[in-house]
Amino acid sequence: MDRRIFGLENEYGVTCTFRGQRRLSPDEVARYLFRRVVSWGRSSNVFLRNGARLYLDVGSHPEYATPECDNVTELVTHDKAGERILEGLLVDAERRLHEEGIAGDVYLFKNNTDSAGNSYGCHENYLVARHGEFSRLADILIPFLVTRQLLCGAGKVLQTPRGAVYCVSQRAEHIWEGVSSATTRSRPIINTRDEPHADAERYRRLHVIVGDSNMSETTMLLKVGATDLVLRMIEAGTVMRDLTLENPIRAIREVSHDITGRRKVRLASGREASALEVQREYYEKAVDFVERRGIRTGTVEQVLELWGRTLDAIEAEDLDRIGTEIDWVMKYKLIERYRAKHNMTMSHPRVAQIDLAYHDIHRRRGLYYLLERKGQATRICNDLKIFEGKSVPPQTTRARLRGDFIRRAQEQRRDFTVDWVHLKLNDQAQRTVLCKDPFRSVDDRVEKLIAGM
């Protein structure tokens, strides 16, 4: 599939610190956060003018699902626009708390674990063709996804009985199955719940829930871009070496606990391979595939260059070569500089604070944004485009139809209901349009519905 629909869903961690007054529960903090949303949307589960969905997920986690995008750079821009929308809600919630005499600071973290050991996710969505064996797709993808954390982990200081260790991935400790239909209880690598949000005879939605949430724009580009290339190879029938893992769940933890990428994991064939070797296999296949197909576009070029350079840098133990582009490396360097300056062990509480503060989405507080201001975080997005993305949907996918419908209905003060595939005016006629094709950004039926308001 040379043109694919992508979507990202990020759940955010919420906390609030209070200066000497009563503490609010996470539920109460979430209510303050969503008060503005509920006041106009009459719900804490809404679709926005940019085509995205914003809602309060299980356990008081705000979740932002990007609109459908058909290119990876636009997807990253819309994910960042979601961050900005939530940052706006955070500032508004703090103001309301202060007006009510509660001196508190609200924090939203784009990470995947809290101090109590709970995990919340970043879910990636890839539209794939319905024909073809899903089990073959999963078999080839799982070794790639287990070792992909070397490219796009967010990094974590893990407290163990033997002291704290720095790991590549936050999510790795919380994955318990390879393929399953659950998302919370057993947490698989690939979720098989079949909700394509599209024509079910033609498409299915690959739902990957193993990845970390990313602060870095370049890490996000690499995560989704490399996965897209692997999917394209599978769809084209590219012959791949059998890299099936003997125990993917053990392997994912082993890979996460080794920042050198050299630790061997057992394959089902009885052989052993390191995460670097597994990734190198997929990378070299991808380079060959792109050359043969003549699809070296700007984005594909960017993805392949960073993918190869990341593997080279880890192999050479020269992390400075990717020190402004890969989340886990950026955070690791930040922590190591701080530890060296203050002569601290990895177990020191200040180190845990840095680990968390990297993911603070408040641009004046968060450590990722401090790096960005200092020119130590490479960017691919444009701030103006991110700002536009808060209210303007992608123009080449179904998100445009949804966004335009919502905008018009709100301007005309009409009551409406939408989801990923339905647009409905709640009037006497109950007019509804079903939009099954996520690639379609122009539709006469929707234009008629909008014109009739």
From Swiss-Prot:
Class of the enzyme per the UniProt entry, highest EC level: ligase
Reactions accelerated catalytically: ATP + [prokaryotic ubiquitin-like protein]-L-glutamate + [protein]-L-lysine = ADP + phosphate + N(6)-([prokaryotic ubiquitin-like protein]-gamma-L-glutamyl)-[protein]-L-lysine
Single Gene Ontology BP annotation: modification-dependent protein catabolic process
Pfam families: Pup_ligase
Residue pairs linked by disulfide bridges in the UniProt entry: none
Signal peptide interval: none
InterPro entries membership: Pup_ligase (IPR022279), Pup_ligase/deamidase (IPR004347)
Pathway the protein takes part in: Protein degradation; proteasomal Pup-dependent pathway; Protein modification; protein pupylation
Name by which UniProt lists this protein: Pup--protein ligase
Species whose genome carries this gene: Streptomyces scabiei (strain 87.22)
